[in-house]
């Protein structure tokens, strides 16, 4: 029998903070849903930054916006973007930050989103970072053990 997603599911089959519960087949006694859950089958539509894995939801906008898979290629709609968040595709001006890049996905790339400068996402872009407090939220990996700051794009894997 399947069980509804609650804060006690296997890490590979459930999100702990689902906007809409996810059905799983097995549960455990501890909170779960690690970033390894970030695959297309896991990242279902959600409209709040806390409803999905933080590697799946976009959290750099003024208003929540739905995503249907990991790391949507564009930032957000015009009313959503913060002034320093996005490029022209989000209805913002050229003053947008050049380091707004795609967040870590299960199958990630380190390419710039529209509005990023080309040099933002070069070979030197993806550096280790382990605490969101030390870096740009779009650049820092949040599931490592030792913090290292970066100032550009996210790295393909956590550690």
Swiss-Prot record:
Superkingdom as given in the UniProt entry: Eukaryota
Keywords: Keratin, Repeat
Positions of Sequence repeats: 8-12, 13-17, 32-36, 37-41, 46-50, 51-55, 56-60, 61-65, 70-74, 75-79, 80-84, 85-89, 129-133, 134-138, 139-143, 153-157
Molecular function per GO: identical protein binding
InterPro entries (alphabetical): KAP (IPR002494)
S-S bonds: none
Annotated region described as 16 X 5 AA repeats of C-C-[RQVSHE]-[SPTN]-[TASPI], given as residue ranges: 8-157
Record GO cellular component, one term: keratin filament
Keyword Metal-binding belongs to the record: no
Family statement drawn from the similarity comment of this UniProt entry: Belongs to the KRTAP type 9 family.
Subunit structure: Interacts with hair keratins.
Described function: In the hair cortex, hair keratin intermediate filaments are embedded in an interfilamentous matrix, consisting of hair keratin-associated proteins (KRTAP), which are essential for the formation of a rigid and resistant hair shaft through their extensive disulfide bond cross-linking with abundant cysteine residues of hair keratins. The matrix proteins include the high-sulfur and high-glycine-tyrosine keratins.
Protein name: Keratin-associated protein 9-3
Lineage: Eukaryota, Metazoa, Chordata, Craniata, Vertebrata
Gene responsible for this protein: KRTAP9-3
């Amino acid at each position: 029998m399947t069980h509804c997603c609650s804060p006690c599911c296997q890490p590979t089959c459930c999100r702990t903070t689902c906007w809409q519960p996810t059905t799983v087949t097995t549960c455990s006694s501890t909170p779960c849903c690690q970033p390894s859950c970030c695959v297309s089958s896991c990242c279902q539509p959600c409209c709040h930054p806390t409803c999905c894995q933080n590697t799946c939801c976009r959290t750099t906008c003024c208003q929540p916006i739905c995503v249907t898979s990991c790391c949507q290629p564009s930032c957000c709609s015009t009313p959503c973007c913060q002034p320093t968040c996005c490029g022209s595709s989000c209805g913002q001006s050229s003053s947008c930050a050049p380091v707004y890049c795609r967040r870590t996905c299960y199958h990630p790339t380190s390419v710039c989103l529209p509005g990023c400068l080309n040099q933002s996402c070069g070979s030197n872009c993806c550096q280790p970072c382990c605490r969101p407090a030390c870096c740009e939220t779009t650049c820092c990996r949040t599931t490592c053990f030792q913090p290292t700051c970066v100032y550009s794009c996210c790295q393909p894997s956590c550690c």
